[in-house]
Amino acid sequence: NLRSVEDRIAPVKELFRLQGASELQEAEERYLPKRQARSRALILAASRGSALGELTEHRPKTMVKIRGRPLLSHIVSAYNAAGIKRINVVRGYLPEAIDLPAISYADNADYADTSELLSLACGLGSDADDSMDLYVSYGDVIFKRYILDALAETDDDFAIVVDTEW
């Protein structure tokens, strides 16, 4: 199945580079729709992740390292790879520990006593722009770019991706 090989699949951009086909890469960039011009992301990352114990004693769950990088860095990379550069992160527990470049932040000071819904409201309130598509994700769920590509293909006003094996 795809899951067993997806980490070994090279993006088309890399194939163009390896083949020295810069004209094809330029054509792809010129003619494919520019998702970043009409999309933004909101990442809900306010929780501590207390179930992780000492691992999150001095850092939020979203800053726990996976393969040498914080969870949040992997998520931001997936958005960037899909052309989504406008990213807003809702912080809560130890907000100063979440400080990645080129993203904006909203803080949920009541994160410990509220749910993700208030974090969503905080994020939406700090970056309101109804003219852009909005992708919302959790700060502790890593996903691949193809998930965003699949969402972008839908004509529906509202779509949710669910991991049926979780």
Segments (PLM) and residue ranges:
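Short, conserved phosphate/pyrophosphate- and ester-handling motifs at nucleotide-, phospho-/glycolipid
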Residues: 20
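Short, well-ordered alpha-helical microsegments
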Residues: 24-25, 95-96, 144-146
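Conserved SAM/SAH-binding loop
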Residues: 48
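Canonical Radical SAM [4Fe-4S] cluster-binding loop centered on the CxxxCxxC motif
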Residues: 54
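Short alpha-helical oligomerization interface
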Residues: 57-61
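The conserved acidic donor/metal-binding loop of glycosyltransferases
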Residues: 139-141
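Conserved donor-nucleotide/metal-binding helix-loop-beta segment in metal-dependent transferases, i.e.
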Residues: 146-166
